């Protein structure tokens, strides 16, 4: 039997905070901080300063590939961070780390594919809360390992830092996280965003020290055809965050390389049962998800499983069964397609414009399945048109009310359609069901353009669930 390692943040009652900081260690964690297609970052900590090196090789060709030259760290340190670059896209690697104090660890990671049509899988694993229910947390993690995804995504509440009674409790909580996920962290790239229990608003929290990420709060992650918008929903700042999110959603919506836009964050805007959805997110973020056609929104926080009916066209999935105490859910609510209170994780099978999900209990039993299809209707080139600049609107009528239209008219307005700018026939662009129109952005536009589409023969309109598609204009040069 494999020897189990306790990832101990050594804690003795007589030690102060500074002493704690000198006596903890962590396992190796693989995350993406740069381009997921060609890089990965490995990070870990030791009790004492040491030098370290990393060796790695393509797992599928070990005989022909001798592996890259090991990367060495010249200066002794307690924290070791290695970013491996120039990797092959869509490849599984084995790695070994060594430090001069005798520590050796081995694990695996995967690089994202360069080909957007290359299939892959990922698992969603949320809400351990430091293994409050250790047996459940270990069982769910073992299930993730058995499912063998290419990487793991998490919307947080990994530990219970916020509600720990003292510093020793914080240490113990993270220690349980590492203990429960020991095999999972060694087997996969683990890409989290913070939950409220992780204390992301506290710059001195372990969240900021443990995870090497593009940003500790909000960041963008491109994996194959998916653009993940990883968002911190803990400290909500209303208009300023919404403005940033609108720009990122527009970039994704109008980028031809992005097939899927998937926001992922901790608190759910919609949840039915013992823990409800977040009203601030419904006010500020949900209208943006609708306007810019988010393909799927992932959250946790409510400890159970809820696959919602599409709300204004947007599918929402709440998965919080990673090991915290379970909450009751309401499977009969009209917003809910399927819900249950169970420990679980979710496997996503990505293949081009289709994602199939399987919600699984720790033993691998699939209790819910669903299929999603990428849903983008409108693209604008350039993505942020400037005043006086010529731009093109492409409208995909397939699957919508204008699918069979003999002619489609572009109805374009300034800001919230408080002034009509354009009402012109669109042209077919050679792709079935797709129409284009080119125009120059008037100088009178202050903030954004608004689009909807019209079939003049039948008198049928298409906007986005009573909200017009948006295009923020570029800032003044």
Report residues per predicted region:
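Acidic, histidine-bearing metal-coordination/catalytic regions of metal-dependent phosphoesterases
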Residues: 19-124, 129, 145-146, 257-258, ...
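Bacterial N-terminal signal peptides
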Residues: 8-18
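Bacterial N-terminal signal peptides that target proteins for export
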Residues: 1-7
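Substrate-binding clefts and catalytic carboxylate motifs of secreted carbohydrate-active enzymes
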Residues: 279, 290, 306-364, 370
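Active-site neighborhood of glycoside hydrolase catalytic domains
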Residues: 185, 281-291
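Active-site neighborhood of divalent metal-dependent phosphoester/pyrophosphate hydrolases
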Residues: 67, 116-239, 260-262, 267-277, ...
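Structural motif
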Residues: 36, 223-224, 311, 351, ...
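Glycan-association/targeting regions that enable binding to alpha-glucans and other polysaccharides
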Residues: 22-49, 59, 374-477
């Amino acid at each position: 039997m494999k020897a189990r390692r306790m990832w101990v943040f050594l804690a003795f009652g007589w030690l102060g905070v500074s002493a704690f900081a000198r006596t903890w260690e962590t396992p190796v964690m693989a995350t993406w901080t740069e381009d997921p297609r060609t890089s990965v970052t490995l990070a870990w900590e030791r009790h004492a300063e040491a030098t370290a090196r990393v060796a790695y090789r393509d797992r599928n060709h070990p005989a022909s590939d001798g592996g890259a030259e090991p990367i060495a760290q010249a200066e002794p340190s307690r924290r070791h961070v290695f970013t491996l670059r120039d990797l092959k896209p869509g490849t599984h690697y084995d790695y070994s780390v060594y430090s001069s104090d005798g520590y050796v660890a081995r694990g695996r990671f995967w690089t994202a594919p360069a080909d957007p049509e290359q299939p892959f899988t990922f698992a969603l694993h949320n809400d351990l809360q430091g293994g409050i229910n250790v047996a459940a947390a270990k069982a769910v993690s073992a299930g993730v390992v058995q499912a063998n995804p290419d990487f793991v995504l998490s919307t947080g509440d990994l530990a219970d830092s916020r509600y720990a009674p003292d510093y020793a409790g914080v240490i113990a909580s993270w220690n349980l996280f590492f203990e429960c996920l020991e095999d999972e962290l060694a087997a996969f790239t683990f890409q989290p965003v913070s939950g409220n229990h992780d204390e992301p608003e506290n710059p001195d929290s372990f969240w900021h020290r443990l995870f090497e990420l593009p940003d500790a709060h909000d960041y963008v992650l491109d994996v194959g055809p998916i653009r993940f918008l990883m968002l911190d929903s803990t400290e909500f700042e209303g208009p300023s965050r919404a403005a940033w999110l609108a720009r990122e959603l527009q970039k994704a919506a109008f980028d031809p390389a992005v097939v899927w836009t998937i926001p992922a964050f901790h608190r759910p805007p919609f949840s039915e049962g013992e823990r409800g959805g977040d009203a601030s997110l419904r006010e500020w973020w949900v209208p943006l998800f609708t306007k810019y056609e988010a393909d799927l929104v992932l959250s946790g926080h409510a400890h159970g499983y809820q696959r919602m009916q599409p709300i204004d066209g947007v599918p929402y999935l709440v998965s919080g069964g990673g090991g915290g105490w379970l909450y009751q859910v309401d499977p009969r609510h009209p917003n809910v397609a399927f819900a249950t209170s169970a420990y679980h994780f979710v496997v996503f099978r990505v293949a081009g414009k289709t994602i199939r999900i399987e919600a699984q209990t720790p033993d691998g039993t699939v209790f819910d399945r669903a299929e999603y299809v990428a849903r983008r209707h409108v693209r604008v080139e350039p993505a942020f048109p400037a005043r006086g600049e010529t731009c093109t609107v492409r409208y995909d009528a397939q699957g919508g009310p204008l699918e069979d239209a003999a002619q489609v008219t572009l109805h374009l307005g300034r800001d919230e359609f408080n002034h009509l700018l354009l009402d012109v026939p669109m042209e077919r662009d050679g792709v079935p069901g797709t129409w284009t129109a080119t125009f120059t952005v008037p100088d009178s536009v202050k903030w954004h353009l608004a689009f909807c589409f019209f079939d003049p023969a039948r008198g049928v309109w298409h906007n986005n669930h009573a909200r017009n598609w948006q295009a923020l204009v570029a800032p003044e040069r």
